Amino acid sequence: MSYKKKRCLKSSIICKNKKAYYNYFIEEVFQSGLVLMGWEVKSIRLGQVNIIESYINNDNLNEMYLYNSIVQPLHTSSNYVSCDSSRKRKLLLHKNEIQYLCNKKNKIGSTLVALSLFWEKSWCKLNFGLAKGKTKIDKRASEKQNEWKKEKLKILKKVKFQN
């Protein structure tokens, strides 16, 4: 009798969009699947993907797409398949989720931004957020808060070592 090995069920992050957290206030975070071609999955497994400038928009009322995400084509991919590295990719969402996102996105200053791409079991998933843009003043304030958090951690470490 043969026993199957249990695969690791942890989700592993492929890439993160750190600029999104710097340029936007993230209000809500959502998760969806992606419709990918075979060569795209192979490239993503190798980590040849970039979602820094990517955003989400709806062409029809029933479908949402990921734009400006770049998946580098493999040099070993076949010749009869056209490899468009920056094509729009369909998101797998329920109809009520799409309607909810469209209503939220129609507010002034709101947009949907890709945050991270990760594996969940054997499926490639996308985390994206409903975001509002930051001004220069907001960016400076968030930098000051981050620096203060780092300073607090340093002080706490010093206090713990002294006791």
UniProtKB/Swiss-Prot annotation:
GO terms for cellular component: cytosol. Its main location: cytoplasm. It is found in: Cytoplasm. GO terms for biological process: trans-translation. It comes from the Bacteria. One of its GO terms (molecular function) is RNA binding. CDD domains: SmpB (cd09294). HAMAP family: SmpB (MF_00023). Required for rescue of stalled ribosomes mediated by trans-translation. Binds to transfer-messenger RNA (tmRNA), required for stable association of tmRNA with ribosomes. tmRNA and SmpB together mimic tRNA shape, replacing the anticodon stem-loop with SmpB. tmRNA is encoded by the ssrA gene; the 2 termini fold to resemble tRNA(Ala) and it encodes a 'tag peptide', a short internal open reading frame. During trans-translation Ala-aminoacylated tmRNA acts like a tRNA, entering the A-site of stalled ribosomes, displacing the stalled mRNA. The gene is smpB. It comes from Buchnera aphidicola subsp. Schizaphis graminum (strain Sg). This is SsrA-binding protein. SUPFAM superfamilies: Small protein B (SmpB). Belongs to the SmpB family. Keywords: Cytoplasm, RNA-binding.
